[in-house]
Structure formats: C-alpha cells, structure tokens
C-alpha cells in the first residue's frame, strides 16, 4: 500500500524538478491535524487513510499530513497535484499527458535501480530485492482518477489509488479511464517499464498493475452542500463567509495540455514559477442554493406555526416568553436574512389567517400548522405552488365572480406593508386577495434577499483560482451587505 507516497519520497532525490514536485505532506515531519473519521484516498499522496477537509475547496480529500502543504487541485500553482488534475471532457491526448508525467517523474531503468540499491544496502537484511525496501519501484502507470462531479463541470485527479473502502461519505468516486486511452497500449507501456526490474519484483509489479488497472468505474456522485465543511465558515455581521486558501502562480495556462507541454519542453520555467508562487487567503461569501435549502429545512423544523393564531404584535423571531411561539434560540447562528424573511412571512400568514378565521390564541391546535412547515420545506422545490394552494384553501376562501378570494384587513407593520405594495405593484393594498396575489406575496417575501432561480448550487470555493481572482477584481467575492458597512465613524 501507499506505493505512490513511497515513490514520491524516494524519487524526489533524482532530479531538481522531482525535488520540487514530489515534496508532499505525507513524507514530512509535520504533526498531523485532527481526523474527521472519513476514510478514503488522499488525492495528493494517494494513500488510503483518514481524511480531513481541504483548506482550498472545503471538501474531504486530503490526509492529515498532506493538509499541512495547503495544496488543492483547484490551485493555479503547477505542483504535482495540479499536474495530475484535468477537467472533462477527458481525451486520449490528456491521458497521454498523465502517462508522460509518470514516466518523467518516476522512471524505471538500470541507473535508477542501482541508485536505490546503494541507498538501501545498509544492513544484510536489506540486500534482498523485496517489496519492503523497493516499493517505490513498483509504481505502475494506471489511468484511474478520483472524480469530483460539480453541478457545471467534472474534475479528474489521476493517481495510483490502491485498496478498497466504502465510498459513501467521500465527495469523489474512482473512475477507470483505460478504455478511453487503449487497454493494450497501456499494457505494453507497463510491460516495457517493468523489463528493467529484477525478476523477483516483476511479478509483484504485474500483480499491482492488473489489480488496479482492471477495476470497474464507480457511478459518479453529485457533490452537495452537505459535503463541505463548516469549520472554515466565519460569522460576521450575522452573515456567513468562507475562508479559502489557494496557491497562485504568476502565469496561467489556458489548458492542461499547454501546462504539460511547458513541463516537457521548458522545465526551468516550471521551477521558476514554483519558486515564485504565493499562497493567498480569500474570504468568499457562502450564498448558494445548497445552503439556502439547508437553512430552510432547519427553519421548517424550528418554526412555530402557532404564531399565526396568536395576538402577538412583536415579530415572530422576537417572541421569548410564550411557550407556543418561542423560536428566539433558533436564530442564534442563522443568517439575518432568514430571520427577516421568517418575520415577514409569519406576519403575513398571521394577518391572512386572522382575517378569515375565528382563532385568537396561540395555544389552539389548527390544521394549518403542518402546511406552514411545508411552505419552508418546499420553498426551493417544484412543490411550492401546490403547497401554497393548500395554504390558501385553509384561509376559508369564498368565490366571487368565479374567483376564490380571502379577506386581508388585519394590521401589519410598515415594512411589510411597503414590501407587499412593491410586490403587487400597487399604490394601495387591496382588502381581498386572490390566490395568485397570495402566492406572489409569499414568493416575493422568500425571494427578497436572494432569487432562488439565480443562485449557484454550490459554494464559491469550488471555483478555480483564476475565477476567484476575477471575482475579487469585480468586487463579487463579498456580499453586498458587507460592502455597506464602514469601519469609519465619519462615514
């Protein structure tokens, strides 16, 4: 196991390029970070171990030792992990770049074998050519990749992933790209590669190659918001932002093939870029549909529908002494926009319900309560219209001129009054509402701070480093609300 890690350790002394590219955290002396009890393959050193969350993309794909390097496959710095990363579609030309990379960094010839013999002959027990001391020579060239399937794109990180483990909690899946290249041609490349090995190691090399190169591809899995860590989220002005670390180089390549051509024909340029690259910290907003869905789901569980039957004049989130309506604790760590939306939505439903029914205390048990929870749970789904129709029917609508309408005459606060006027585009609010107006008001309240249809599915931390730099120049990394707050007392 951990053949790739061992190869990185021993081959790093071969050339100057290897010394820079093969310096991975798993071979360092740094103290490991706390485990998150997720077992899988570290995409940097390829060993099967306990993983932790990457500081660059917030996904669990790096081991407790490699995390010290703070490298991510989304970096722009041409380190080893970046060189093994390709975006879809995968072509034969890209796979040839992977093969050439392995052949350049991990060659097997008589010179290399003799070099390793000299470095390991320290005692008599090391004279034999066995797997224990020469594991670095047993690295076959395979075309397996850890695949991250984002909403808009798919990223392949190639490596030698040995062993098996449950992938249920992993954000990636292992895919075998051998058939995209050429199965027989890859076999020939590995047979020629192992010819220089001693006979005792050739059989072990062949077993490793065929065992890993013939594994079937796993079914790809879409990455969801729940796959991202919350450890790098910070709360500021009751908004959440995510800390992202990226390694940035002065030069960017348009395609992965251009990067590999530079490595092949001008390795000194790669060495220069590696020595001048810098690490940058970005503070990106965390507004995305995945987080909104999670917050809405939590709000549906925590909400107190009894408020719509009450005579409380305070906003729904400020009730603290009523045991049927108290939800104040639920907004301790929740975004301020969720609290604002909750207050307006509950106040509007309360006004409609009190205008059309005979209830006057929050302790009463009403059949409308489960539907109010469903409004939050279905707010980002296609079932929202059906749920709002059910909610409207609970208001005891009457038919006037073949149209169902409800009364709307209870007192509401000024901010909600102005907001409803803006949604309906009216100068004066009507005293009756039809079903379409009722649905438009609720959807307008929910979409007040962010339009669900225009939100990205996943956080900004999955974007490439180049994209983050462009968004930073445009001022789109931070939330607009943050930009309105000044640290100066004079502003």
UniProtKB/Swiss-Prot annotation:
Annotated stretches, region: Important for cytoskeleton localization: 82-176
Superkingdom field: Viruses
A Pfam family per the record: Rota_NS53
Motif extent (pLxIS motif): 483-486
Keywords: Host cytoplasm, Host cytoskeleton, Host-virus interaction, Inhibition of host innate immune response by virus, Inhibition of host IRF3 by virus, Inhibition of host IRF7 by virus, Inhibition of host RLR pathway by virus, Interferon antiviral system evasion, Metal-binding, RNA-binding, Viral immunoevasion
Gene Ontology CC annotation, any one: host cell cytoplasm
GO molecular function: metal ion binding; RNA binding
Keyword Transferase: no
Ranges where the record places region RNA-binding: 1-81
Subcellular location: Host cytoplasm, Host cytoskeleton
Keyword Metal-binding: yes
GO process annotations (BP): symbiont-mediated suppression of host cytoplasmic pattern recognition receptor signaling pathway via inhibition of IRF3 activity; symbiont-mediated suppression of host cytoplasmic pattern recognition receptor signaling pathway via inhibition of IRF7 activity
Region described as Zinc-binding domain: spans on this chain: 42-79
Region called Interaction with host IRF3, residue ranges: 318-491
Segments forming a coiled coil: none
Chain's role: Plays a role in the inhibition of host innate immunity by inducing the degradation of key host factors required to activate interferon production such as IRF3, IRF5 or IRF7. Associates with components of cullin RING ligases (CRLs) including CUL1 or CUL3, which are essential multisubunit ubiquitination complexes, to modulate their activities.
Domain remark in the UniProt entry: The integrity of the zinc-binding domain in NSP1 is important for degradation of host IRF3.
Family per record: Belongs to the rotavirus NSP1 family.
Assembly and binders: Interacts (via C-terminus) with host IRF3; this interaction leads to IRF3 degradation. Interacts with host IRF7; this interaction leads to IRF7 degradation. Interacts with host CUL1 and CUL3.
Protein name in UniProt: Non-structural protein 1
Organism placement in taxonomy: Viruses, Riboviria, Orthornavirae, Duplornaviricota, Resentoviricetes
